[in-house]
Amino acid sequence: MKMFNNIKNTGKLIRLERIFDKKSEKTVIIPMDHGVSSGPVAGLKDMRTAINSVAEGGANSVLVHKGIVRHGHRGYGKDIGLIIHLSAGTGVSPDPNEKVIVTSVEEAIRMGADAVSVHVNMGAPTDCQMYQDLGKIAETCEYWGMPLIAMMYPRGEKITDEKDPEFVAHAARLGAELGADIIKTNYTGDIDSFKDVVKGCPAPIIIAGGAKSTDAEYLQMVKDSIEAGGAGVASGRNVFQHKDVIGITKATAMVVHENADVEEALKVIKK
């Protein structure tokens, strides 16, 4: 895949092909790590059903914590990639923006992971520790041939707007500078400003799915991010909390991989 031409580690390249579409060179990831931060939220009470639904809808990968792997493993149907999240923090913590490492790269390898992810909140009181963690994990991932996704969010006292293009561009570049292979971050809200974010980051960028919105608004955001040079989407609540999980996953994949119009993609969602 051309976007990963700068990666020479064969192990990373083989694993990346399991979470990216080889033709479009883009990805649809469904994060399902919310149980740690928020508890068993709607849509994720039955993890096996949730994972089965997005797999049947054509998602490239799910992203979960280590304890969920055994509960969501699929022995049938469509293949789906596995990304194991290494960071944790809860919404009831004294500092919800603090993330600590709870899983090792080696443990993720033993579980069959195709990639690992780390969460960093740029601007949080403990952000320097998160930077250190990311840098160390990047070194370990390079050694083992494990792709690393950095979830890079501008969040903290000095962050006036988490979607501000300058903050988003800084967060994305920070993740790439510290060794991440793929960056997940906020969409800035318009194509031109996100183009600048993509231009300033040497690693491919996928956008977060954002807050719950209408199907049309969500799919338009995804389409705009792709037009701006994004490499896909990692969408949680807009997918797994949908009344037609399979349909919205299919629609997302159509926009990301087939460059479908929003109106066309909306037709596959059951009303």
From Swiss-Prot:
Job description of the protein: Catalyzes a transaldol reaction between 6-deoxy-5-ketofructose 1-phosphate (DKFP) and L-aspartate semialdehyde (ASA) with an elimination of hydroxypyruvaldehyde phosphate to yield 2-amino-3,7-dideoxy-D-threo-hept-6-ulosonate (ADH). Plays a key role in an alternative pathway of the biosynthesis of 3-dehydroquinate (DHQ), which is involved in the canonical pathway for the biosynthesis of aromatic amino acids.
Stored HAMAP family: ADH_synthase
PANTHER family, sorted: 3-HYDROXY-5-PHOSPHONOOXYPENTANE-2,4-DIONE THIOLASE (PTHR47916:SF1), FRUCTOSE-BISPHOSPHATE ALDOLASE CLASS 1 (PTHR47916)
Family of this protein: Belongs to the DeoC/FbaB aldolase family. ADHS subfamily.
Keywords, ordered alphabetically: Amino-acid biosynthesis, Aromatic amino acid biosynthesis, Schiff base, Transferase
Gene3D superfamilies: Aldolase class I (3.20.20.70)
Top-level taxon: Archaea
Binding site for 1-deoxy-D-threo-hexo-2,5-diulose 6-phosphate: D33, H34, G35, V36, S37, Y153, P154, R155, G209, G210, G236, R237
GO molecular function, one term: transketolase or transaldolase activity
Record-level GO BP terms: amino acid biosynthetic process; aromatic amino acid family biosynthetic process
E.C. code: 2.2.1.10
Listed InterPro entries: ADH_synthase, Aldolase_TIM, DeoC/FbaB/LacD_aldolase, DeoC/FbaB_aldolase, FbaB-like
Organism, as annotated: Methanococcus aeolicus (strain ATCC BAA-1280 / DSM 17508 / OCM 812 / Nankai-3)
Positions of the catalytic residues: D33, Y153, K184
Catalytic activities: 1-deoxy-D-threo-hexo-2,5-diulose 6-phosphate + L-aspartate 4-semialdehyde = 2,3-dioxopropyl phosphate + 2-amino-2,3,7-trideoxy-D-lyxo-hept-6-ulosonate
Pfam families, A to Z: DeoC
Quaternary structure and partners: Homodecamer.
Name under which the protein is recorded: 2-amino-3,7-dideoxy-D-threo-hept-6-ulosonate synthase
